[in-house]
């Protein structure tokens, strides 16, 4: 079986593939089907020979297509149907289980709790594992101050630090988003599936600054749903982030984000676990036991 985290991981007539992988010249419009064919061809050119050489060393037969090999007989989409509905895919059946959530109930650090309690809900910014420039902290602090908001920056893998040490901004390390997000005014992030889903469950507006892959899908979804907006990370400036913050802090978007949280809630991990047991029992030819 194969687990995917966004509908754009599977070829579809409804959704184009995420970048990189669209190899056509931008001046030539292509159908979604042709974009997927180009993507699959590019993937095979990059990886097929290397995979088959390794398989040959192990005495295994060669494969003909990377994606067909990766997508097993059972393909599960670990994403909420309200946030990321799976479109019809004529090539294969996909079971949408809902998001696989491991609750993070670690208490917030005392310093973070004290910061939250000192004023209005702040803006949270985190780019996870993305290799962002250290200079982005200047942009973040300036935009937050322009909108009159306090700021929490997550260090992330880029080890971000504050541009200055004003009392209106703090930096945090690894922290429970489950407990923090319901207490912030908005979440600015790169568009990772986990951060997107957690912010949606928390009912807070989002600003996604996508950099590659399925992050562009998630940025388009939160915009379509009216629970946030997007701004290109490559051209992120104080002005562009200020505009985005002003947009998502509008009462209409705040209300939509709050209401949308009630639509996100299926425990996809439990659904997947039940399906896994059913598949295992069917494969063994018996009903099995608890």
List PLM regions with ranges.
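C-terminal amphipathic helix plus adjacent low-complexity
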Residues: 239-290
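Donor-nucleotide binding loops and adjacent catalytic segments primarily
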Residues: 79-186
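A donor-sugar binding/catalytic signature common to diverse glycosyltransferases
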Residues: 172-221
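Conserved nucleotide-sugar donor-interacting segment of glycosyltransferase catalytic cores
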Residues: 1-33, 82-83
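Short beta->alpha connector loops at strand-helix junctions that form conserved
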Residues: 3-5, 191, 208-212, 230-235
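Long, low-complexity segments enriched in small/aliphatic residues
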Residues: 47-99
């Amino acid at each position: 079986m194969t687990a995917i985290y966004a509908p754009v991981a599977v070829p579809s007539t409804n959704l184009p593939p995420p970048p990189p992988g669209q190899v056509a010249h931008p001046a030539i419009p292509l159908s979604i089907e042709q974009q997927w064919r180009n993507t699959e061809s590019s993937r095979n050119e990059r990886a097929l020979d290397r995979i088959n050489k390794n398989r040959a060393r192990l005495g295994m037969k060669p494969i003909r297509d990377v994606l067909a090999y990766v997508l097993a007989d059972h393909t599960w989409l670990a994403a909420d149907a309200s946030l990321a509905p799976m479109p019809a895919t004529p090539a294969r059946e996909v079971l949408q289980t809902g998001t696989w959530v491991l609750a993070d109930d670690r208490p917030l650090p005392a310093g973070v709790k004290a910061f939250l309690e000192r004023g209005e809900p702040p803006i949270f910014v985190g780019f996870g594992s993305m290799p962002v420039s250290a200079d982005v902290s200047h942009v973040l602090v300036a935009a937050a101050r322009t909108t009159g908001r306090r700021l929490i920056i997550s260090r992330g893998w880029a080890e971000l630090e504050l541009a200055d040490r004003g009392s209106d901004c703090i930096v945090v390390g690894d922290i429970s988003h489950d407990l923090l997000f319901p207490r912030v005014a908005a979440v600015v992030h790169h568009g990772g599936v986990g951060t997107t889903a957690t912010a949606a469950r928390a009912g807070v507006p989002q600003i996604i600054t996508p950099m590659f892959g399925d992050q562009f899908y998630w940025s388009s979804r939160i915009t379509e749903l009216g629970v946030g907006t997007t701004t290109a990370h490559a051209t992120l400036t104080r002005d562009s982030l200020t505009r985005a913050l002003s947009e998502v802090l509008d009462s209409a978007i705040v209300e939509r984000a709050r209401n949308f949280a009630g639509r996100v809630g299926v425990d996809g991990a439990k659904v997947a676990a039940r399906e896994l047991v059913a598949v295992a029992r069917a494969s063994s030819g018996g009903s099995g036991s608890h």
